[in-house]
């Protein structure tokens, strides 16, 4: 996989690091991460993972954005109030980095569905 000029510029700070380099950035772009919850911890994690160029990110959350969420769940904005958190998060992440594929799961995580959620991301 060759980087586009835009990707070279976007990921330049990773690429110049010996510990990451071109090889490491390619691993990130081919990486997959599942985030449980798009709230106080999941929201900033999702933004950083998208900005870093993690290629496929799954987000699981059954909740909707509430006005009281906005001071700490920075992935959501005022216009997102009432919207599913996974939809709001996906929109923000895609706007931030079009290289990232975001898969949403609007459901609660349970002991019965956790393996299916993980496997669905692995097999994408």
At which residue positions do the language-model features occur?
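Adenine nucleotide-associated cytosolic modules
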Residues: 1-122
């Amino acid at each position: 996989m060759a980087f586009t000029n835009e990707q070279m510029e976007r990921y330049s700070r990773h690429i110049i690091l010996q510990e990451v380099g071109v090889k490491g950035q390619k691993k990130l772009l081919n990486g997959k991460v599942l985030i449980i919850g798009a709230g106080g911890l999941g929201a900033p994690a999702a933004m950083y993972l998208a900005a870093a160029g993690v290629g496929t990110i799954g987000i699981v959350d059954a909740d909707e954005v509430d006005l009281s969420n906005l001071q700490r769940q920075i992935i959501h904005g005022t216009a997102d109030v009432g919207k599913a958190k996974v939809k709001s998060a996906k929109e923000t992440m895609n706007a931030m980095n079009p290289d990232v594929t975001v898969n949403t799961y609007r459901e609660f995580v349970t002991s019965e569905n956790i393996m299916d959620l993980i496997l669905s991301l692995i097999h994408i």
